[in-house]
Amino acid sequence: MRHKIFALVIVTALFFGVVAVSSAQNANLTIGLSVPSLEETGFFATLTAEAQNAADAADAQLTILSADDDPAIEADNLAQLIADGVDALLIYPLDAATVIAGVQAANEANIPVLLLGEDVERTESEIEVASLVAADPAAIGELAASYFCENVSEGSTVVALAGISGLEADTELAEDDYRVVALQAELEGLSAVLASDCATITLTAQETATFTNEDSTAFLSNALGSNVGGVFAPNGELALSTIRAARAARLLSSIKILAAEVTPETLGAIESNRLAGIVSATPESLGQIGVETVLAVLGGEEVESTVSVELALVTSESVLEFRGQDDDSGDN
């Protein structure tokens, strides 16, 4: 079955072969890895385990610190890693403002920084980031479209929601804002594959009213209709709002809803059969390729400003494996 066990799609295969610098050199290198949490989803536990494996294979040292979902702890962790004199920082952002301040401090200390999973605003803050290791947003839209082509009836409509997590409706972003660019790429990837592979399915883009309160559910209720077969939500908040709106309209069982963000809530929605799936970077590839990329930087190699990683379509069939849990029936 195409989508079983993550339905892995390799977006960009990045292999540096043997690590960029020799094992003898790597033994003297220490990489600091900051993650938002090691709880709830299993996502970051898997990411850090693969990062540790990649560091061990290269004889490099890896220091892993969790922010426990607290920006204050994230700030302390970044300050501690910089004070400890790590050779490079890998950061999966929890709080953008905290990360920007941490990157600025690392830049001043001449410590190269790579971001994992998510970007932060760089233009106004003038921070320097060696590379962003993350999912290709266009490929996220393409994989979502492939799912809709296989699971939504011909003649149906797919609604693509355009919204950025944490922003209110009156917030204006520049066209070149990294969040706007990424969202546009997702929608373009979605549109291109639907048009080429299942032209009988109509794509409708919807601008959402707000993204953080109950008004979004009311807005979405007006966007959903009897002919809607699928909804693409670019973040967890919109996915959960869509679920509430579909349930209120008594359409939840007939609409396939996909999210493009892993959160404890979206994973729980898959497990309770309220959410069809999540399109996400695999934590394994983020951890492995993140370490490989930072070692290449430390070895003096030129790396791309953005390095794409593997994608997964997480469904009810693969959610336990994605969490790093056994799915054998009867096991606890």
Where are these regions (language model features)?
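Short, low-complexity disordered leader/linker segments with a strong preference
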Residues: 1-30, 104-111, 153, 327-332
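Hinge/cleft segment of the Venus flytrap/periplasmic-binding protein
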Residues: 27-29, 169-171, 175, 194, ...
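Extracytoplasmic "Venus flytrap"
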Residues: 30-54, 58, 63-76, 86, ...
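Short, solvent-exposed amphipathic alpha-helices that sit
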Residues: 42-58, 140-144, 169-201, 215, ...
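Short, well-structured alpha-helical segments in soluble
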Residues: 72-86, 214-227
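Hydrophobic alpha-helical segments within soluble ligand-binding/sensing domains
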Residues: 74, 132-159, 215-217, 262-266, ...
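Hydrophobic alpha-helical
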Residues: 91-108, 190, 205-268
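Flexible loop/hinge segments that line or gate small-molecule binding clefts
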Residues: 96-139, 147-150, 157, 161-172, ...
